[in-house]
Amino acid sequence: MEPVDPRLEPWKHPGSQPKTACTNCYCKKCCFHCQVCFITKALGISYGRKKRRQRRRAPQGSQTHQVSLSKQPTSQSRGDPTGPKE
């Protein structure tokens, strides 16, 4: 064991960083690649914001879904069935 400079932070010690970069793979080897991989992949802990998935848009030529929606009867609005009070 080689001596470590006590002024260095623990995460900057030699040998603390893996020689290969982290990947998006979730196999057992990659899950135990480093501490960050273990926490995020093996334990599933992430503190970042979750990205919202964008819906797939239909091609420009297909408007059939919108047409079929307009043919359906409109549902009554929820709320007071007697109407607005004045």
UniProtKB/Swiss-Prot annotation:
Keywords attached to this Swiss-Prot or TrEMBL record, sorted alphabetically, are: Acetylation, Activator, AIDS, Apoptosis, Host cytoplasm, Host nucleus, Host-virus interaction, Inhibition of host innate immune response by virus, Inhibition of host interferon signaling pathway by virus, Interferon antiviral system evasion, Isopeptide bond, Metal-binding, Methylation, Modulation of host chromatin by virus, Modulation of host PP1 activity by virus, Phosphoprotein, RNA-binding, Secreted, Transcription, Transcription regulation, Ubl conjugation, Viral immunoevasion, Zinc
Q: Which GO terms describe its cellular component?
A: extracellular region; host cell cytoplasm; host cell nucleolus
Keyword field contains Ligase: no
Residues carrying N6-acetyllysine: K28, K50, K51
Q: Which Pfam families match?
A: Tat (PF00539)
The reply to whether Ribosomal protein figures as a keyword in the UniProt entry is no
Tell me which residues bind Zn(2+) 2.
C25, C27, C30
Q: Where is this motif: Cell attachment site?
A: 78-80
Q: What does this protein do?
A: Transcriptional activator that increases RNA Pol II processivity, thereby increasing the level of full-length viral transcripts. Recognizes a hairpin structure at the 5'-LTR of the nascent viral mRNAs referred to as the transactivation responsive RNA element (TAR) and recruits the cyclin T1-CDK9 complex (P-TEFb complex) that will in turn hyperphosphorylate the RNA polymerase II to allow efficient elongation. The CDK9 component of P-TEFb and other Tat-activated kinases hyperphosphorylate the C-terminus of RNA Pol II that becomes stabilized and much more processive.
The protein in question is named Protein Tat
Phylogenetic classification of the source organism = Viruses, Riboviria, Pararnavirae, Artverviricota, Revtraviricetes
